[in-house]
Amino acid sequence: MQVCIIGAGLSGSILYRLLSEDGFYINIYDHVLVRGCKSMNFIFSNKNEILTVKKVLKTVNINIKDYIIREIKEVNIGGDNYYPNKKIYVINKSKLIEDLVPRTVVTNREFNPVIRRYTTKVIDTGVIVREFNTEAETKFYDLVVDASGCAKVLQLGNVYDKYKNDIKTCQFLIAYENEESPEKFDKFFIDEIKIHKGKPMIGYTWITPIDDGLYHVGCAYYKNDHELWTYLTKYTKKMFGSDYVRVCGCTSKINGNLISESFIGGIYEKRCVAGVGESIGLTTPLGHGNIYAIISAYILSRFIKKYDLNEAVLKYKDYIPKKFAELDKEKKAVRNFNVLRITKLLRDYYNIPAHESMKIILKSLY
């Protein structure tokens, strides 16, 4: 069986390794040179998720402990410290992805479901001409998997519906050394929480300590790239002063669509198509999705190995919305401004008391 995976991020790389173990012929496409640098936090909701991720990675001879930079045991939210209810680890995600699928294995270009090819020939008069024809690149594969994350390459529908719920992000990697107070930023910082009416994602600003004076500073809001870059530049200077160096920076987005609104899998133009990870809406309202990227890739690989391909994809399509139904409930609660559900969400993640959550929610409106 010939498989095409679009995207060599976390979910695509996991799926590639899992299927490679069973001898599938796979091509994996990704035009991005640096992978895995935009989200480094692995947030586990329960012990079962930890065990599942360990099991999946062990299957491909990966020990997650080798990639843990630090465990986040304390979170500062709006100036107050809390002890999160969930296990939060900062992971060297770029190294993990590279060890799963080296860059040399990846076809370094975008994958186009429909492409224009041309042939060159000499006609009867001796003139060299080009003849164009349109072909579906998917015709070479039995299964095409969308692991493209926020790009959502194979998601159907018009462009507005495809991206209307996505929240924009701006992110910096900075180097900062302060010998006088080295513990100043030794915890996870969350600031400027914003609930956007009618939108499923929660906006906020964060600082994640990495290692050796490196920090991942970012923000996510329903604003344009220029506004976010300007805001984050000012925020970084406010927090770190002038004694920092910006190593790199980028703007991106996070898929805010519901799973139930996404194209998860099926038979499309006589080809089996499926999606994994962020591309099908497997993100929380706070933008976390690394764990679900791994688990969804594992589920798809199990179904493919157990059933005929057509049956596997259809079973996967039915199973995923049920498995991750809680994610849709959380996003709907935020979109509908369900105060009780949002309060519960903040408590479940960061152990924020109800009265403090109410202050955050009310402040976010203004």
Curated annotation (Swiss-Prot):
InterPro entries to which the protein is assigned, alphabetical: FAD/NAD-bd_sf, Geranylgeranyl_reductase
Superkingdom to which the source organism belongs: Archaea
Gene3D superfamilies: FAD/NAD(P)-binding domain
Protein name, entry field: Uncharacterized protein MJ1182
Organism: Methanocaldococcus jannaschii (strain ATCC 43067 / DSM 2661 / JAL-1 / JCM 10045 / NBRC 100440) (Methanococcus jannaschii)
